[in-house]
Amino acid sequence: MASTDNRDDLIARLNAETAKIRWHELQKHYAAGNLLGVSADEDLIKIAIAFHQDETTRVKNWLASGSLFEVSDNQAQQWFKDDAELWAVVIPPFVLVQEVSH
């Protein structure tokens, strides 16, 4: 039962630490190579939990499927042009971002 409580606590903490942020505030993380995108059809928190728990196989599978991706220069330029607002959560050393669905 403790592991369920710990997982629930982790979910609550990550939800509380997730926020909308403008692209211009994320550019330094992109420039440092620490920014990863999460596709709109994935759960940002689920992926953040996998990073937090060092679930390497799951992370590699998401990278292979494109559900998790390195933000391309073209995407970064588009977000800059649009002054995009993104969901973001920090899982050191990474910042995971996901486009805000409208």
Where are these regions (language model features)?
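Generic secondary-structure microfeatures
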Residues: 40-42, 63-67, 93-95
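Short, hydrophobic/π-rich interface segment
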Residues: 46-78
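Short, compact, well-ordered microdomains
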Residues: 69-102
